[in-house]
């Protein structure tokens, strides 16, 4: 194996040791540290402008005398990617700082809102003026840059931010670790490490297979331990002071764990953490060498990945030893803690006490009416002299899973009444009198809501909610109206899904049983119809007459579009491309056009001459549906079922192209379609694997997949140009809209065939 080539600068060990750094691994820094600093300054400026909460004045960011944090943990990053990494890192720092200063309830709300902002499956509406929406704007622009630089790794990083950092940041937050292994597991899950590694991959442009990840995981585990413990070692004094002074409500440290579980003094606990850091670095090197010995022909890609993981450990260690974030406390006066003689001022709930920290054990801390209890993932329960308890954690709040109840309190009387009717013998004697005396009351909505609740709980791409948020950048619809519009769109969309599955005789919806399979056809139809009624009620009660007109007109268009889709399938009549696109404009595009028109009816924005969103929505509807047609034959099949459109006999875009341009395959396709059941009363049965394989082969041979992908790329380019035009007219960039398109981009779609 030849030596690895570097594009970063080596930092001599003696230079690093001047800051108190004791890492045993080599340290390197990116040659373009200026790019990282510029991105950090941009983040601080963007935060101040968008958030306006002054938090940027209270947070120590990635800057340090020895280099930017991102320059040290990503020293080998592709230069064009260093800036966005620094930007995201500073977002993480300020988000953590904000959470540490909140109660557990406030932190949970903060995490839940930001998770919703980044979660395409979330159906809740965001207040345009909320912190989550403002943060979403910051993240959208940055993530758009990431996706444009590397579509696959950029999307992976976005998923890590959303599904790992935010969704499980409170995992096991109520547990107290008793061993270092437990603590490291919790901190690895909750402390951002599962986000860091995708960021490192992105920095290098390295994609790893599952097998490659598994091969190097023991080495990465050692690196993770080194990263976490270095932060604990250098941040202990700062975090302790912040908790004691009331600046923070949580503390994250293995120092406390060792002091509590091993009965060590704080000084000895810090030394134990230091020894463990050195051991983790030794384990990293030993495991790396063992792997190289066992697999001497290991790829240069994996060698580079392992090497850069080690550089991240040493770079983080060096930065922690010198950065103001961890070391500014050293310049504090008595009012901020240490008085210069090893004494600290501690607030016990009744006032300040000055106590020595040297040889202060965890037991001594408890005797001073302050008890710091690690919860296992860096969180703590702070007990003061009054017995008040605040349970806090390292990074935010645990995500809650929605649960459906079989009966609500308002429905319980209905259940009890039925039971009493079953056992009341007096009814048998006085049927006429009892019936005449029953009071009139509204029945329970349990049965009617069940199919709706079921369909709304299914996974979703969340495109409509994202589009509402993005368009509101320009339309400035009040938050109350946005909530109503989001609710109405969700109701109508879910109702259409129930009816679509019935009309298509489809047993599956995104890999799950369709609503009518669970609740029956009649009950599902009734529920879907009521969802339409409820949606119109909400518009009539909460929005303007113009909004109601828009909803009713676009509902008509939805039904018209669906009528032709059903007609073609039942009569085995293939539409022309123009007819098919017109159907899309009404059936699929109608929902997008509806939300636009309703938002325009409620908009408070000043009218701009020439500002017209019609073409944007028209193109978006076509792009969305034709992409869905294409993906049904590809990896999207894992969610919807293998080529489900073929089971339904659907004339999708590839089929329309094939039949219009290659009549030699007409008999093949229509012959198979003719044999499928066309009415919902007939038990649905998917086409055989052999039949599907034959039809896919016909589409591949005639170039239908290439034509469809080419069409998508053309429409995507038109969409990008339309967004450019609208941004020029409004004078306001719309990163959320661009990110919405980027997530659906053809750049990340493989060519079928």
UniProtKB/Swiss-Prot annotation:
Bridged cysteine pairs (disulfide): none
User: So what does this thing catalyse?
Assistant: isopentenyl diphosphate + (2E,6E)-farnesyl diphosphate = (2E,6E,10E)-geranylgeranyl diphosphate + diphosphate
Where is isopentenyl diphosphate annotated to bind?
Answer: 461, 464, 493, 510
The residues listed in the UniProt record as binding Mg(2+) 1, with positions renumbered to this chain, are 96
Query: How is it applied?
Result: Fusaproliferin shows cytotoxicity against pancreatic cancer cell lines and provides a new chemical scaffold that can be further developed to obtain more potent synthetic agents against pancreatic cancer. Fusaproliferin and its analogs show also anti-inflammatory activity and can be hit compounds for the treatment of inflammation-associated diseases.
Q: Does the keyword Lipid biosynthesis apply?
A: no
Task: Identify the residues that bind Mg(2+) 3.
Answer: 500, 504
* InterPro entries listed in its UniProt record: Isoprenoid_synthase_dom_sf, Polyprenyl_synt, Polyprenyl_synt_CS
The pathway this protein participates in, as annotated, is:
Secondary metabolite biosynthesis; terpenoid biosynthesis
User: Which Pfam families has this protein been placed in?
Assistant: polyprenyl_synt, Terpene_syn_C_2
What's one GO MF term for it?
Answer: dimethylallyltranstransferase activity
Could you tell me which SUPFAM superfamilies the record lists for this protein? Terpenoid synthases
This enzyme's EC code(s): 4.2.3.-, 2.5.1.29
The residues listed in the UniProt record as binding Mg(2+) 2, with positions renumbered to this chain, are: 96
Q: Report, from the record, the phenotype seen after gene disruption.
A: Leads to complete loss of fusaproliferin production.
- Motif DDXXD 1 covers 96-100
This protein's cofactor list reads: Mg(2+)
Annotated region described as Prenyltransferase, given as residue ranges: 330-745
Record-listed Mg(2+) 4 binding positions = 500, 504
Pinpoint motif NSE/DTE by residue range: 231-239
Q: What does this protein do?
A: Bifunctional terpene synthase; part of the gene cluster that mediates the biosynthesis of the mycotoxin fusaproliferin (FUP) that belongs to the class of bicyclic sesterterpenoids. The FUP biosynthetic pathway starts with the enzyme encoded by FUP1 that combines a C-terminal prenyltransferase domain responsible for the synthesis of geranylgeranyl diphosphate with the N-terminal terpene cyclase domain, to yield preterpestacin I. Preterpestacin I is then decorated by oxygenation steps that are catalyzed by two cytochrome P450 monooxygenases.
Family as reported in the entry's similarity comment: In the N-terminal section; belongs to the terpene synthase family. In the C-terminal section; belongs to the FPP/GGPP synthase family.
The domain comment in this protein's record states: The conserved DDXXD motifs as well as the NSE/DTE motif are important for the catalytic activity, presumably through binding to Mg(2+).
Q: How does it assemble?
A: Hexamer.
Protein name, entry field: Bifunctional terpene synthase FUP1
Species whose genome carries this gene: Fusarium proliferatum (strain ET1) (Orchid endophyte fungus)
What are the leading ranks of the lineage?
Eukaryota, Fungi, Dikarya, Ascomycota, Pezizomycotina
